[in-house]
């Protein structure tokens, strides 16, 4: 029995869901998203409640049951509130500037890094040392934030680089005399 899968997903006001076959489409104030489940589960919409049930009790069906329920819950959260990842830049001369769908990064290289932001995600820079990635697709927001962080991940000696807000960087001592 999946403890996650057996909980139904409630649809808040202003959000609608429609099921056709194995695909559920959720529409809300921030946009629309869809998810196609495997044949191991059945998705049903009753009023403002979405419930997922397994078609059998095989190990795969139970795994897909909990995963499908979480994916539908993420669809609902995305179209109502959206998802957000915040990044901090640490280092002398390291800064970021968002211009349209391009993020310009000065990260100590001999050239500026121009990062093109994909559709469905918005990137803003409230300060030169902060980057905010927002969107309705949790996976895409996390992927864009990870790609930005990849350009200069934090190093353990001085802590310079791009880190997630609140991320702990394990620090090392330098050489000892």
UniProtKB/Swiss-Prot annotation:
The keyword Ribonucleoprotein applies. Keywords: Ribonucleoprotein, Ribosomal protein, RNA-binding, rRNA-binding. The keyword Cytoplasm does not apply. It comes from the Bacteria. GO terms for cellular component: cytosolic large ribosomal subunit. One of its GO terms (biological process) is cytoplasmic translation. PROSITE patterns: RIBOSOMAL_L6_1. Gene3D superfamilies: Ribosomal protein L6, alpha-beta domain. GO terms for molecular function: rRNA binding; structural constituent of ribosome. Belongs to the universal ribosomal protein uL6 family. HAMAP family: Ribosomal_uL6_B. Part of the 50S ribosomal subunit. This protein binds to the 23S rRNA, and is important in its secondary structure. It is located near the subunit interface in the base of the L7/L12 stalk, and near the tRNA binding site of the peptidyltransferase center. This is Large ribosomal subunit protein uL6. It comes from Ruegeria pomeroyi (strain ATCC 700808 / DSM 15171 / DSS-3). The lineage of its organism: Bacteria, Pseudomonadati, Pseudomonadota, Alphaproteobacteria, Rhodobacterales.
């Amino acid at each position: 029995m999946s403890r996650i899968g057996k909980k139904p997903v409630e649809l808040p006001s202003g959000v609608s869901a429609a099921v056709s076959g194995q695909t559920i489409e959720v529409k809300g104030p921030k946009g629309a998203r869809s998810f196609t489940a495997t044949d191991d589960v059945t998705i049903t919409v009753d009023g403002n409640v979405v419930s997922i049930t397994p078609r059998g009790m095989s190990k795969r069906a139970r795994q897909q049951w909990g995963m499908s329920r979480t994916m539908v819950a993420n669809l609902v959260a995305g179209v109502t509130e959206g998802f957000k990842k915040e990044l901090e830049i640490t280092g002398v001369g390291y800064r970021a500037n968002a211009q349209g769908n391009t993020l310009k990064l000065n990260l100590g290289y001999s050239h500026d890094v121009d990062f093109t932001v994909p559709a469905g995600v918005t990137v803003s820079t409230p300060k030169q040392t902060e980057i905010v990635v927002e969107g309705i697709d949790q996976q895409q927001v996390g992927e864009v934030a990870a790609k930005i962080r990849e350009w200069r991940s934090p190093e353990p000696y001085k802590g310079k680089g791009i880190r997630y807000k609140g991320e702990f960087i394990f620090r090392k001592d330098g050489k000892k005399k």
